[in-house]
């Protein structure tokens, strides 16, 4: 089954309790509790330990891994030695194969995304499979002769990887999916998947293979409005159909009414997936009120530093401790801006890495991509400038219309994720000209 809900509605807590319930009521069962990335899995592991403080033995039958990490472990246990191809070990062969087949109109960027999202994503291993595949989300229409030319490139890449003893992460998960689909005993009786909206095609196929042996063997929790890593694809085509088996959480436990309602302006009231499942974002209710979020467009970086410094000063006056405060930016290129604001107030900064460990006595600084799963009493989202979010470099790399739409959607989702990490206080700042998203976050005539 699938459970959805906007940020702060308790999807992760429900997933944790679901995993514990499955282990408790099925004494011989093994349960996989998973997320799509290692940093998020690390955070989930810590939360499970806290939940099972009085039942530590229960945790022995619940394994917490990222999907790729458990894939690597199972591959080496059941298949053999594993050598995962790096991005460079795939990108350069694509470039070389492209040159080898002669002149054509396709850019290296197009070839790379076609490989990632279609050929490797769906693990197409024959010309016929590539010829007939529905290239969902790829708006560049390809005639059969164009597909044949492209396949000649990708076939060179596939054979080259095989000759070098390399396999992609998608390939690894595909081998495992076939292994279990062909009758091997699944390593888990149940799989509980949190942050499911960012699972890849190969990850969903792998989960479908290991979770098919039990009724309700698979449980997914996620929010399409927080999809920031994956392009949309059909879960049904990948082996998982949740139509008619979904529920939506409506009570927001984390975020004040003022912050939630302001952040909701960034997203449409309804978001549909490729299979036609619709997530209704209306009707969520927060359990408490708080100060109105502040949005400031400053004339310079120095003015922004002073504004955030003054905000930090007011938080200290209200009794907040540094570890209860976080500042998020789009990428590491903007880290100097939160550091300068903290320094103005004499506060130490802890730059979060993939372990997501905060430090007593320090406010946290992080990119928006690492914000998932985190919660702070006060959050500032800095450097929301034009060409920073949405990131101009991503826009310039776009090769087709559908990809541009997805860039805008995921960048908007990033800002939503960052803003909804705040419980009580939210400040969003930029220098002029500001990101176009700020005009959606709050009406233009209310910008300060």
For each feature predicted by the language model, list its residue ranges.
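Short, electropositive alpha-helical surface patch
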Residues: 436-448
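ATP-hydrolysis module of ASCE/P-loop NTPase motor domains
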Residues: 78-146
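Conserved pre-motif I regulatory segment
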Residues: 1
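Conserved helicase motor core of SF1/SF2 NTP-dependent helicases
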Residues: 4-32, 36-84, 143-146, 152-166, ...
């Amino acid at each position: 089954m699938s459970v959805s809900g906007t940020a702060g509605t308790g999807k992760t807590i429900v997933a944790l309790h679901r995993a514990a319930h499955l282990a408790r009521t099925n004494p011989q069962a093994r349960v996989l509790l998973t997320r799509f990335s290692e940093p998020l899995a690390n955070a989930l592991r810590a939360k499970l330990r806290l939940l099972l403080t009085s039942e530590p033995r229960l945790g022995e039958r619940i394994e917490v891994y990222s999907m790729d990490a458990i894939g690597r472990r199972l591959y080496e246990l059941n298949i053999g030695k594993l050598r995962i191809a790096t991005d460079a070990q795939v990108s350069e062969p694509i470039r070389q194969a492209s040159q080898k087949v002669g002149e054509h109109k396709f850019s290296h960027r197009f070839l790379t995304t076609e490989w990632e999202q279609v050929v490797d994503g769906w693990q197409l291993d024959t010309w016929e499979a590539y010829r007939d595949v529905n290239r969902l989300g790829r708006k560049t229409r390809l005639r059969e002769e164009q597909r044949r030319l492209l396949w000649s490139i990708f076939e060179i890449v596939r054979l080259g990887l095989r000759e070098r003893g390399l396999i992609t992460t998608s390939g690894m998960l595909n081998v495992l999916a076939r292994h279990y689909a062909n009758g091997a005993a699944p390593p888990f009786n149940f799989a509980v998947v949190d942050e499911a909206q960012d699972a890849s095609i190969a990850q969903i196929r792998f989960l479908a293979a290991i979770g098919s042996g039990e009724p309700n063997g698979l449980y997914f929790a996620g929010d399409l409005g927080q999809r920031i890593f994956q392009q949309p694809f059909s879960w049904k085509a990948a082996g998982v159909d949740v139509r008619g088996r979904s529920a939506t959480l409506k009570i927001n436990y984390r975020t004040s009414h003022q912050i939630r309602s302001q952040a909701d302006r960034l997203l449409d009231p309804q978001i549909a997936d490729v299979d036609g499942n619709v997530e209704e974002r209306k009707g969520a209710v927060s359990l408490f009120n708080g100060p109105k979020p502040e949005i400031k467009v400053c004339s310079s970086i120095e003015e922004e530093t002073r504004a955030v410094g003054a905000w930090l000063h007011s938080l200290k006056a209200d009794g907040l401790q540094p570890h209860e405060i976080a500042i998020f930016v789009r990428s590491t290129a903007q880290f100097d801006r939160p550091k300068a604001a903290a320094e103005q107030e004499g506060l130490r900064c802890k730059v979060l890495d993939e372990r997501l460990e905060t430090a007593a006595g320090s406010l946290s600084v992080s990119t928006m991509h690492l914000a998932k799963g985190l919660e702070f009493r006060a959050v500032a989202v800095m450097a929301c400038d034009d060409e920073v979010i949405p990131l101009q470099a991503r826009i310039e790399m776009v090769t087709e219309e559908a990809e541009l739409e997805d860039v805008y959607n995921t960048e908007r989702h990033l800002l939503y994720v960052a803003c909804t990490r705040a419980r009580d206080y939210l400040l969003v700042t930029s220098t002029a000209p500001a990101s176009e998203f700020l005009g959606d976050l709050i009406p233009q005539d209310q910008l300060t």
